[in-house]
Amino acid sequence: MDLRLAGRRALVTGAGKGIGRSIVKALHAAGARVVAVSRTQADLDSLVRECPGVETVCVDLADWEATEQALGGVGPVDLLVNNAAVAFLQPFLEVTKEAYDMSFSVNLRAVIQVSQIVARGLIARGAPGVIVNVSSQASQRGLTNHSVYCSTKGALDTLTKVMAVELGPHKIRVNAVNPTVVMTPMGQAAWSDPQKAKAMLDRIPLGRFAEVENVVDTILFLLSDRSSMTTGSTVPVDGGFLAT
């Protein structure tokens, strides 16, 4: 199925590794013009070697002023994927101010800021656009040691709905994807303990974790005009976890 993404200009945050990097590669392969955002220059440099022509921006999205300076003049953007996120796994009684502040700065505040930049540009141009926020199954379930992470993703789901309501009249669609554990290198390392993995897999009706392409394919569909009537949705990519 041709998603007709060729020629569209897309901005992807958290583009240096994992899901974000794979999103950039898929968009590039589909003919989109991609702006890749990461806080790690070495990751961006290697990404450009893989995908010549990709534009890069190196900035720490936890820094509001630096983000404004780096992205304020990014130019016209048609598609935005807010993928950047951090996760500090701490028991509730041991949550630190530093983990709380960093988590909400990156997982929620940066989404607001970058989305504002892109949406204002779309409205000024009178152009339609699409925003996809990468959330998590953790937004809708209580997971041990994930109190702050779950909170940020729950807030992101609600933000997605509000953005869809307010930006819809401007022909800007906003959706979220909510993956289960994804088999990125980080995911593989975090869930390598068979006992830990079994406890989660037993809660997934399909009995497996998600592959990166499962998430990327869903995001590309939501970015495309094939989903032109879909906005304000949180789309599980979880093998049925949230259905249980």
Swiss-Prot record:
One of its GO terms (cellular component) is cytoplasmic microtubule. It comes from the Eukaryota. The modification N-acetylmethionine is found at M1. Keywords: Acetylation, Carbohydrate metabolism, Glucose metabolism, Membrane, Methylation, NADP, Oxidoreductase, Phosphoprotein, Xylose metabolism. GO terms for biological process: D-xylose metabolic process; glucose metabolic process; xylulose metabolic process. The modification Omega-N-methylarginine is found at R21. Its main location: membrane. It catalyses: xylitol + NADP(+) = L-xylulose + NADPH + H(+). Substrate binds at S136. Belongs to the short-chain dehydrogenases/reductases (SDR) family. This is L-xylulose reductase. It comes from Bos taurus (Bovine).
